[in-house]
Regions:
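Bacterial Sec-dependent N-terminal signal peptides
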Residues: 1-24
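Short secondary-structure boundary motifs at beta->alpha junctions and helix caps
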Residues: 69-81, 151-197
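Generic short beta-strand segments
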Residues: 41-46, 121-127, 161-162
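Surface-exposed helix-capping loop/turn segments at secondary-structure junctions
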Residues: 98-108, 195-200
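Outer-envelope beta-barrel architecture signal
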Residues: 4, 33-37, 114-116, 153-155
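A structural "domain/chain start" motif
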Residues: 18-86, 90, 193-200
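Surface-exposed short loop/turn segments
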Residues: 21-22, 103-154, 166-174
Length: 200
């Protein structure tokens, strides 16, 4: 048990260190005083390793599954898109919000009370894999941009995160949605920490 715990800690430490951020526009200080954000997620022109497009990725994965079991390909496609609302997006919001003990800053979908929007544009996604004896973390790159709802063309702040890696504790992430969801959680954690320190 101690060895498993040590491995889990090392995996988390490596994941946090591997993640990088680069400010693309504006300054962290532009976000000072903002207490609520409406979340918006975008997955257009998503890059997936070894494929020209997300469409090519889906065609390949669906065909391979369909050969083994009729109907499995369509189920894979349905799950692939469903994972966004079931895993990626709620994990991002949950991870971000729990970094603020007094709820000084909150994010969420369809927050009518929020005057600002936080847009998470995913640019790269590697789902990773877990086949028991072998596994690889998921990896996500995304651009987080903030703008006022009544001025969406005026970006107050934009930052790009690369190499946000996802894995569940003790390797319990055989489902790709769980692995990728953890990458979004780690990205949100890093963003919240930077926001807390730099938006002053």
């Amino acid at each position: 048990m101690k060895k498993l715990l040590l491995i889990a800690i090392l995996l988390v430490s490596t994941t946090i260190q591997a993640q990088k951020s680069k400010v693309l526009e504006g300054d962290w200080k532009n976000l000072k005083g903002i207490s609520a954000y409406n979340l918006e997620f975008e997955y257009e022109n998503l890059e997936i390793p070894k494929y020209d497009s997300e469409e090519d990725f889906l065609k390949d994965k669906m065909a391979k599954r369909e050969e083994k079991e009729p109907g499995a390909g369509e189920r894979f496609k349905k799950a692939w898109f469903a994972d966004r609302e079931e895993h990626y997006e709620p994990k991002f919001a949950e991870s971000f919000n729990k970094r603020w003990d007094d709820k000084e800053v909150v994010v969420g979908r369809d927050m009518a009370s929020a005057d600002y929007t936080m847009k998470i544009q995913t640019t790269f996604l590697y789902p990773g894999y877990n086949v028991g004896v072998m596994r690889q973390n998921s990896k996500v790159d995304a651009i987080i941009s903030v703008y006022k709802n009544d001025a969406p063309d005026t970006i107050l702040f934009s930052v790009k995160y690369t190499k946000a890696e996802g894995n569940a504790a003790f390797g319990n992430d055989y489902d790709s949605g769980v692995r990728v969801g953890e990458a979004y959680a780690k990205m949100a954690k890093t963003f919240a920490k930077e926001l807390s320190k730099k938006a002053k």
